[in-house]
Amino acid sequence: SIGSAFKKALPVAKKIGKAALPIAKAALP
């Protein structure tokens, strides 16, 4: 179902977000 897929994707999205945060900060002037 959509709910189970969303629950599986949520922790992955959080990991990607944490990984992207320092990259985004470094990219900013």
From Swiss-Prot:
Query: Would you name any one GO CC term?
Result: extracellular region
Q: Localized where?
A: Secreted
Outline the subunit composition: Homomer of four to six subunits.
What biological process terms from GO does the record include?
Answer: defense response to bacterium; innate immune response; killing of cells of another organism
Annotated thermal dependence:
Thermostable. Still active at 100 degrees Celsius.
> According to its UniProt entry, what is the function of this protein?
Female-specific peptides with potent activity against Gram-positive and Gram-negative bacteria. They have as well hemolytic activity.
Could you tell me the keywords of this UniProt record? Antibiotic, Antimicrobial, Cytolysis, Hemolysis, Immunity, Innate immunity, Secreted
Full protein name: Ceratotoxin-B
